[in-house]
Amino acid sequence: MIIVWGSVETTAEHLPQLLALSLEHVYRSREEPGCLRHSVHIDAENPNRLVFYEEWQDQAALQAHFHVPESSDFMRSVSEKAVGAPVMKVYAASPVE
């Protein structure tokens, strides 16, 4: 399984639009093959920061997600409204028995 964790900080002015864009991206991504989980949350300690959590079946599914045109459009929109650079970390994971 592949886990993606990311975050983006924005301004109070841009937060509603960025949250709406993020939810649209999450809902669309959940329909993609290999997407096990995709969510966005508002950081409890910084309400202008959105935190993303994703689980993908494998690296191939994640790479396919990155090549969906709407994913590129989303990242471009996020970058335009971000304060600083968005953060994204990708991990290979397996369950602990």
Predicted segments with their positions:
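Active-site-flanking beta-strand signature of metal-NTP-handling nucleotidyl enzymes
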Residues: 2-8
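Short, glycine- and small/hydrophobic-rich beta-strand elements in well-ordered beta-sheets
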Residues: 26-51
